[in-house]
């Protein structure tokens, strides 16, 4: 079983108030099951839920979650929710029940803000539904991870434009009590090396902190350059976990089309299905 990393060893910073991680080692923490905490918390209005299993709509974020990955009843609920012969992404998962086929697997790391300099970026603009075609184009060229037609509904997304063209992006994905994930960090290859990604990460973090939340993020466990960048910005490695793409037991019912939840064929270590590539600040 994966365990959180104690962040306070080796010369801790002075503490004037309890930090959200104070009980991370001794008690279950929302970040240990972040997708479930989001779907049963601030993102409950987006959840497709059955008992102890839940998932996001297929065009929002292609992940499902279990209240307790060690609970057979939660797996039974996920099977009923997803249906037979369907592929689902789930994290974190250590052991998969008999009858569930592992289609793909990888490891990701979770990092939390402990010393990030958060500040607005005057050149950043807020992005909305009208900007989704441009966002999808940038994401397709830079491959920061999944971004779907309605992902923008998860939180605030900021972008930087050059001569009117979107060249950099970052925003909020998972939101759970006290915590918000920074995601979709990417920069057009022609505009890297200018610090655009760093400015957007700090700007998104400023908005997260303004409402009293702590920023966190995920990266592929083997993406050393990305992890190095995030740590240099003030994020601390908290934990590593396993992400899986599974096919549920049974034969799918006949249908005329293939639902987006059924189109997954592989999973990167960050759970995105594609490698996280933006590492240039």
PLM regions with names:
Residues 89-94, 207, 216-227, 243-250:
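Conserved beta-strand-loop-alpha-helix junction that forms the acyl-donor binding cleft
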Residues 1-96:
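N-terminal charged segments
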Residues 64-68, 185-192, 220:
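A short, internal acetyl-CoA/4′-phosphopantetheine-binding micro-motif in the GNAT/acyltransferase core
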Residues 95-100, 198, 221-239:
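Conserved active-site alpha-helix within GNAT-family acetyltransferase domains
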Residues 146-156, 160-187:
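A conserved beta-strand-loop-helix scaffold within acyl/acetyltransferase catalytic domains
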Residues 2-32, 110, 114-145, 251, ...:
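Short amphipathic alpha-helix that is part of the acyltransferase structural core
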Residues 73-78, 193-208, 227-232:
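Conserved acetyl-CoA-binding loop-helix of GNAT-fold acetyltransferases
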Residues 101-113, 218, 236-250, 281:
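Conserved catalytic-core motifs of GNAT/GCN5-like acyltransferases
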């Amino acid at each position: 079983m994966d365990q959180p990393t104690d962040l306070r060893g080796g010369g801790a910073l002075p503490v004037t108030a309890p930090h959200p991680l104070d009980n991370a080692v001794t008690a279950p923490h929302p970040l240990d099951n972040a997708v479930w905490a989001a779907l049963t918390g601030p993102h409950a209005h987006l959840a497709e839920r059955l008992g102890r299993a839940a998932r996001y709509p297929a065009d929002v974020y292609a992940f499902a979650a279990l209240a307790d990955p060690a609970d057979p009843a939660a797996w039974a609920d996920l099977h009923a929710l997803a249906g037979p012969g369907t592929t689902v992404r789930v994290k974190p998962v250590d052991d998969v029940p008999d009858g569930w086929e592992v289609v793909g697997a990888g490891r990701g790391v979770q990092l939390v803000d402990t010393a990030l300099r958060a500040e607005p970026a005057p050149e950043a603009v807020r992005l909305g539904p009208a900007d989704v075609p441009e966002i999808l184009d940038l994401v397709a060229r830079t491959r920061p991870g999944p971004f779907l037609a309605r992902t923008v509904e998860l939180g605030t997304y900021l972008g930087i434009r050059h001569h009117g063209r979107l060249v950099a992006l970052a925003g909020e994905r998972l939101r759970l009590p006290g915590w918000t994930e920074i995601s979709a960090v990417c920069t057009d290859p022609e505009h890297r090396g200018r610090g655009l990604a760093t400015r957007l990460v700090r700007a998104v973090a400023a908005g997260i902190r303004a409402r009293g939340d702590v920023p966190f993020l995920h990266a592929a466990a083997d993406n050393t350059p990305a992890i190095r960048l995030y740590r240099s910005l003030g994020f601390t490695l908290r934990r590593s976990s396993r992400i899986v793409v599974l096919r549920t037991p049974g034969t799918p019912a006949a249908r005329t089309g293939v639902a987006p939840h059924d189109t997954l064929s592989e999973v990167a270590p960050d759970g995105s299905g594609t490698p996280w590539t933006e590492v240039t600040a």
